[in-house]
């Protein structure tokens, strides 16, 4: 069989014959959806997708594995705050009991259910530990919601950049020494905000970073959205609560069997103003929280509490076998780092005759394997306890088969190191200005941005309002635009709105 991609024709060798799967693919393809002309509902599309044999190497963590979850959701239990069913915003009954169970499982002092995703947890945490105009130390590879909190509270960010691993092409961990240096140089910093693990699975030394923050008598907030499974098996790192973080945010839906949009915020025994964090949770979360989503979190916690070892042990066995098999790749390469979340599978295409976007298309179109993300020189596959042995073997064998059809090729590496920028004004100051104009990318160099620009996923800003646009920023944007990626956040294509300081 021959797969024709945008840049290259790849002959797929092996004994795969035409199957019903391939025939169904011809009549059902995500790319053929026409939302404007179709009368189908979102549910209709979801129903059709559920009947196909597409297997998801991506979140959410339940992986549509209904057999694992011993319950039936959702319409019959989709209620509101009626008698005996408690209230998320003033929990003192069944919701409080459920949150206390989650706190015990995660070794936290206090846990709150989030039905607006990790985003609302990050916003509430940052705004809860800072006051207007405060300084905050922020890892530059944090999610865009961190930058939105900075804007909302008119904060002055001090950035710490992650290491860049030239060998793997990944933005690495945040160095403890860098954080120590910046805290010593900026004594007015009121909090530290990092992301660990990153979208790619890189883990920072949260324990030592927490110790440094506490020496300076300030709290550490950890966006551990992608590490909701941490601490439940020795194959994975301890979670950030166990490592001394003051506030931790988990996206339960990303790597555990819970519905999309579900998350947790944990607060630990520190000097954090808990009332203020709770106040922002009440302000920013929906006043009509979904009981289906809350039930999903609670069912997930109960499953881990009662059957944690039963579900994690075979899952870890499958992961170890996968990594062993993928170590046999000749041209594609399974990326490994010293501090890594082994539930993630980063497959590098460096020095092969195929691009990451080509690989993603082959996996999707021929093998019906949908990846989580394509970025730079690699594709990212996410696994979770909801994965089946058969699904993971299918992913492994597809990569091995594709690998046999490839050859070596020296090619220009795709640059992923975050460009360094200079903060000239607070984002809140710039975004409140009315005077601005749109410039072409090249013309904008040296000017101050009034817009965010980022690739999504993972949602890490390349440029933030108030930062000076550099040649490196524009080179970064141009490279990804030429590779076919969508640059989000910019109002006008290939232009940036800049501040006119008159």
Region roles according to the model:
Residues 99, 237, 360:
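Generic structural marker for isolated residues within well-ordered, non-membrane alpha-helices
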Residues 34-93:
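N-terminal "arm"/small-domain region of PLP-dependent enzymes with the aminotransferase-like
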Residues 324-489:
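Conserved C-terminal alpha-helix-loop-beta "cap" of PLP-dependent enzymes
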Residues 486-502:
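Charge-dense polyanion-binding interfaces
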Residues 42-49, 68-69, 90, 118-336:
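Conserved PLP-enzyme active-site core in the AAT-like
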Residues 75-117:
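Conserved N-terminal alpha-helix of the aminotransferase class I/II PLP-enzyme fold
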Residues 1-15:
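Ser/Thr-rich, low-complexity intrinsically disordered segments
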Residues 14, 18, 24-32:
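Intrinsically disordered, low-complexity segments enriched in serine/proline and basic residues
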């Amino acid at each position: 069989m021959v797969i024709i991609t945008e840049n290259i024709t790849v002959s797929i060798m092996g004994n795969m014959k035409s199957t019903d799967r391939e025939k169904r693919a011809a009549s059902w393809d995500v790319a053929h959806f026409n939302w404007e002309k179709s009368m189908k509902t979102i549910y209709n599309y979801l129903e059709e997708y559920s009947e196909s044999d597409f297997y998801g190497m991506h979140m959410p963590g339940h992986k549509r594995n209904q057999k694992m979850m011993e319950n039936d959701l959702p319409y019959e239990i989709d209620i509101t705050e009626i008698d005996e069913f408690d209230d998320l915003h003033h929990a003192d009954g069944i919701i409080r009991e459920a949150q206390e169970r989650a706190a015990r499982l995660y070794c936290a002092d206090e846990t709150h259910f989030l039905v607006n995703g990790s985003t609302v947890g990050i916003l509430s945490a940052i705004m809860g530990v800072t006051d207007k105009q405060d300084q905050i130390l922020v890892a530059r590879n944090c999610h865009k919601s961190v930058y939105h909190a900075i804007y909302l509270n008119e904060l002055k960010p001090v950035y710490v950049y992650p290491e860049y691993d030239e060998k793997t092409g990944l933005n690495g961990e945040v160095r403890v020494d860098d954080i120590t240096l910046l805290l010593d140089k900026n004594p007015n910093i009121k909090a530290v905000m990092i992301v660990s693990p990153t979208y790619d699975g890189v883990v920072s030394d949260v324990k030592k970073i927490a110790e440094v923050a506490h020496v300076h008598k300030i709290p550490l907030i950890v966006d551990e959205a992608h590490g909701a499974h941490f601490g439940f098996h020795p194959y994975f790192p301890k979670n950030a609560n166990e490592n001394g973080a003051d506030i931790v945010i988990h996206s339960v839906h990303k790597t555990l069997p819970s519905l999309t949009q579900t998350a947790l915020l944990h607060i630990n025994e520190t000097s954090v103003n808990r009332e203020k964090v709770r106040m922002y949770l009440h302000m920013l979360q929906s006043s009509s929280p979904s009981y289906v989503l809350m039930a999903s979190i609670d069912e997930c916690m109960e499953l881990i509490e009662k059957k944690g070892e039963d579900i994690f042990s075979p899952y870890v066995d499958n992961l170890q076998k996968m990594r062993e098999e993928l170590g046999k790749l000749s041209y594609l390469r399974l990326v490994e780092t010293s501090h890594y979340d082994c539930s993630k599978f980063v497959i590098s295409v460096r020095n092969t005759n195929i691009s990451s976007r080509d690989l993603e298309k082959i996996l999707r179109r021929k093998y019906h394997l949908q990846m989580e993300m394509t970025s730079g020189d690699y594709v990212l596959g996410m696994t979770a306890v909801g994965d089946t042995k058969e699904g993971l073997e299918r992913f492994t064998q597809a990569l091995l088969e594709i690998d046999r059809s490839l050859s070596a090729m020296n090619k220009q590496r795709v640059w992923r190191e975050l460009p360094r920028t200079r903060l000239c004004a607070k984002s809140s100051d710039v975004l409140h200005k009315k005077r601005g104009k749109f410039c072409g990318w090249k013309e904008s160099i040296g000017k101050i941005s009034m817009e965010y620009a980022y690739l999504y996923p993972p949602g890490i800003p390349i440029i933030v309002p108030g930062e000076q646009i550099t040649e490196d920023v524009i080179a970064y944007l141009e490279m990804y635009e030429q590779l076919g990626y969508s640059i989000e956040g910019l109002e006008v294509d290939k232009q940036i709105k800049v501040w006119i300081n008159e």
